[in-house]
Amino acid sequence: MVSQRILCLAMALSLAGLSQPSSAAEAPASAPAPECAANAPLDTRVEAVLAKTDRSDKQRANDTNRLSETRFVLAHVKPGDHVLDMGAGEGYASMLLSAAVCTGSVDSQNPQGWVDFYKMSAARDAMAAARPNVHLLTTEFTAILKPAAPYDVIFIGTIYHDTYNEKGQDAVAMDKALLADLKPGGLVILTDHKTVDGAGISATNTLHRIDKAQVLSDFKAAGVELVEDSNVLANPADDHAKIVFDPSIRGKTDRMALVFRRPL
């Protein structure tokens, strides 16, 4: 009798064990970061990338002035994208793009002269250490190495005018070389400080501004189509007569916000 009771108890315990789900089955799948969730609203993505705790106080200090540009750029970037951030400086936009592309990657480019003159090395190295999906490119605008895979997006943030200040620069040739590294259907997102209509490139090295008509002409000649010409960064109060670093207008200049697409 005792042996029968022991046998029954053993069987009951065994069945009870079989009925319990394993701890692995109980563990829920980890949710993606808010900026990486499928179909996440733009506001959610922007708030999430700005909230990253590894961003410096210097970067955060620019968030208010650059919010409209950030929203404009991130509206055209998605998780998994491979992005070139051209003339990236210390990496304000590169950090935001790094979070926004999630499993994608960002090539953060600067000419060596910029890195040396503006003493960017420490900030760039810190960014690359904090964000494994950011790769530093230190090369001239006309010598950007061909990526292993074509870019989904090329971002040229308020520095296109600077490319005209490089000796021997051929803007259209540079644009064509960049577009060769962009996948068919890929986007070029460009913002820059506007000068008075008809000024062409006369103020690129003095006021650090460029005529929007010049930019449109350059990229048309390079073979891309304009798909968006937004006024999101417009400021009618800017008289276009001041250098963009003037304290009265810095961060509030009248800027173009353009999106070009490489044909399929």
Regions found by a protein language model. Name each.
Residues A237-L264:
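Core SAM-dependent methyltransferase catalytic element
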Residues G91-M95:
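Glycine-rich SAM-binding Motif I of class I
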Residues G80-G89:
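Conserved class I S-adenosyl-L-methionine
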Residues K78, V101-C102, L182-P184:
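Helix-to-beta-strand junctions that scaffold the AdoMet/dcAdoMet cofactor pocket
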Residues I144-I154:
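A short acidic, Gly/Pro-enriched loop at the edge of an enzyme's catalytic core
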Residues D170-P184:
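A short glycine-rich, Lys/Arg-flanked "PGG" loop and its adjoining helix->strand segment in the class I
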Residues P41-K78:
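Class I SAM-dependent methyltransferase Rossmann-like catalytic core
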Residues G185-H193:
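Conserved beta-strand signature within the Rossmann-like core of class I S-adenosyl-L-methionine
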